[in-house]
């Protein structure tokens, strides 16, 4: 995709695709920072890539998401470089749902089951909100509301 200064209407989808294309040119999926870590930095970005894919149907976007997840989740469904005691490392699990739906690959179900068990046992504050991390007692961070 080339970004030009023509008179084409610049819709939100136009800008979403421009952002996705830029990141895809800059980083191979498995190299998205922090490289080799199942983390919310990639999870939030790739959630946006998935929404862009849903709107425009460009299968390259779905393949990019799958490539990143497959670099973190092995054939047995084990997630490497994931701390289940941190919401930051649970957030990318949202990507596993569409991968399971579209591919039927059971590794994504096994990875989801692992994350579900972690979140069910995750510590909560008095109001029921999740602690940001197991080692941050009673701390509920704003981004944790999203995660």
Show the residue positions of the predicted features.
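A contiguous, low-structure linker/loop signature
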Residues: 85-125
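Short, hydrophobic transmembrane alpha-helix segments
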Residues: 31-34, 54-56
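Flexible, surface-exposed loop/gating regions in the mature catalytic domains
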Residues: 126-145
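N-terminal basic, low-complexity leaders that serve as flexible interaction/assembly modules and, when applicable
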Residues: 2-4, 22-25, 31, 37-44
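Long, well-ordered core segments of solenoidal/helical folds
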Residues: 12-31, 60-80, 110-129
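Well-ordered alpha-helical segments within folded domains of soluble proteins
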Residues: 38-54, 84-101, 140-147
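Mature N-terminal, pre-catalytic/accessory segment of carbohydrate-active enzymes
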Residues: 1-12
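A short, Lys/Arg-enriched amphipathic alpha-helix followed by its capping loop at the start of a domain
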Residues: 12, 51-58
């Amino acid at each position: 995709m080339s970004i030009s200064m023509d008179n084409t209407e610049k819709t939100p989808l136009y800008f979403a695709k421009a952002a996705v294309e830029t990141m895809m040119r800059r980083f191979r999926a498995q190299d998205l920072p922090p490289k080799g870590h199942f983390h919310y930095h990639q999870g939030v970005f790739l959630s946006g890539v998935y929404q862009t894919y849903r709107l425009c149907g460009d299968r390259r976007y779905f393949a990019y998401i799958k490539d990143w997840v497959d670099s973190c989740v092995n054939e047995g469904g084990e997630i490497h470089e994931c701390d289940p005691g941190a919401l930051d490392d649970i957030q990318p699990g949202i990507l596993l749902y569409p991968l399971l739906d579209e591919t039927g690959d059971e590794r994504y179900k096994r990875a989801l089951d692992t994350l579900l068990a972690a979140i069910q046992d995750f510590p909560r504050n008095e109001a029921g909100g999740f602690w940001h991390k197991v080692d941050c007692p009673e701390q509920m961070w704003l981004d944790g509301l999203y995660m």
